Amino acid sequence: MMHCLVGSEMCIRDRLHSLVGLAAMLVGYANFLSHATEYIGIEKTIHDIETYLGILIGALTFSGSVVAYLKLSGKWGGKPLLLPARHWLNLGLLILAIYFGFAFVTEAAIGGGVEPLIFMTIIALLFGIHMVAAIGGADMPVVVSMLNSYSGWAAAALGFMLSNDLLIVIGALVGSSGAILSYIMCRAMNRNFISVIAGGFGTGTSSSGPAIEVEGAVSYTHLRAHETVHH
């Protein structure tokens, strides 16, 4: 009961978009370090993949949610942070995450692979910050919807890791509904859905063609108030 009261008070005071990502990250680490159930063979590989994905998505969602909160509350400027070669930076972070994931999954020792997991967590946190920081304030509704989808997928990965069917179902529902809503919002705002997922679509491209000149004479017609009344 005390935990519920403390959690409710935190939800009222803190206006972060979601703490699901932080919960997924912490539970993933706790489950990995507890060694409550030791898997071998293909079961260990599958469980390690589930753990890795849960922590990866959770860390990305949490750091992105913090930046989104700062932007929406006015504590972070609404102007997008456009770093040079930011798309190559995102690609590099993705490649590093895949590399550390391979190193983590192929670790033969039970409980091994802590270093790749920590490095991946740092990369995911940085990627979440960079992804949301590169988005302008006008596009934040799409970002919030996408982060909501990410939190659902993080919960689903947690459900697979913990063999919890309820978490899997709820996470899949939240993730899929958030993704569909984000797609609809992108269509309405004339945004590219893939660009939203990848991050860094902060500014739209504007037309650079010549200005249109209006030619011809302009005529004016003056009307009196009583002339506009029809009997």
Model-based region annotation:
Residues 22, 59-70, 125-129, 153, ...:
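Transmembrane alpha-helical segments of multi-pass membrane transport proteins and ion-pumping complexes
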Residues 10-11, 153, 167-168, 180:
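Active-site loops and adjacent core secondary-structure elements that bind or stabilize anionic groups
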Residues 173-220:
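Membrane-interfacial segments at transmembrane helix termini in multi-pass membrane proteins
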